[in-house]
């Protein structure tokens, strides 16, 4: 424990802002040339002769480095890539043979649309989101107790992807679902580890509450802002 003199020193320091750097203490606008802090703009599409704007930007970067585009992939390879990325599984023989045999000029667009409408799409992309927000179906720590109702939030995320929920609503529902009528969405806030191995004393329980609140703040920062706010608990962000 701190001595009375040490406690008084801390009180004095807080009272007169001893040691504070005025440049840090004063709030200021973010000054950085990092791309994530720049205003969103629509850049002009490079004129490279490609039909897809993404290919045009890729081609421009390759040209600047004296590189060339890879040959166009075969239909078989494209179908395989599409299913692996969107559903996490390779196409069945029936799917592949049916696509290759079709003479429909719109078969690629139809295949993509069918994949997006399949429930597996939501299951696949929900995994990416749940990993990002530190979702777990157990509490962690020594006891690692199962969370009997965690699946409700997991299924809510899957349904949100399959229903094509607008992103602004998706975010709002997870941060303030209890206010906007999407209570299941707030599972985001408590998806992290929960320490049940704490002593009965009030001090340790209060500390555990602060740890969980800090976890919520850090998860919000890393998920929606791309910034690690957790270090600001002990350090000044610059």
Residue ranges of each PLM-predicted region?
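Aromatic- and Gly/Pro-enriched helix-to-coil junctions and flexible linker segments
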Residues: 1-178, 237
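Sequence context surrounding c-type heme c attachment/ligation sites in exported
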Residues: 1-7, 181-238
């Amino acid at each position: 424990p701190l001595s009375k003199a040490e406690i008084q020193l801390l009180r004095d320091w807080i009272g007169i802002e001893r040691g504070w750097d005025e440049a840090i203490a004063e709030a200021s606008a973010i000054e950085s040339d990092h791309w994530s802090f720049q205003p969103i703009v629509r850049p002009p599409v490079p004129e490279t002769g490609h039909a897809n704007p993404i290919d045009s930007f890729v081609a421009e970067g390759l040209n600047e480095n004296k590189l060339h585009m890879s040959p166009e992939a075969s239909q078989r390879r494209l179908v395989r890539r599409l299913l692996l990325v969107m559903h996490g599984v390779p196409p069945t023989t029936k799917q592949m043979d049916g696509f290759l045999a079709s003479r429909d000029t719109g078969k690629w667009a139809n295949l993509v649309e069918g994949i997006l409408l399949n429930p597996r799409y939501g299951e696949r992309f929900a995994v990416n989101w749940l990993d990002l927000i530190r979702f777990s179906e157990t509490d962690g720590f020594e006891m690692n107790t199962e969370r009997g109702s965690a699946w409700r939030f997991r299924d809510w995320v899957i349904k949100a992807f399959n229903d094509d929920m607008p992103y602004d609503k998706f975010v709002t529902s997870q941060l303030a679902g209890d206010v906007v009528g999407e209570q299941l969405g707030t599972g985001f806030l408590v998806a992290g580890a929960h320490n049940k191995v704490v002593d009965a004393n009030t001090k340790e329980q209060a500390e555990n509450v602060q740890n969980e609140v800090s976890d919520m703040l850090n998860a919000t920062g890393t998920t929606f802002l791309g910034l690690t706010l957790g270090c600001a608990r002990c350090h000044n962000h610059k």
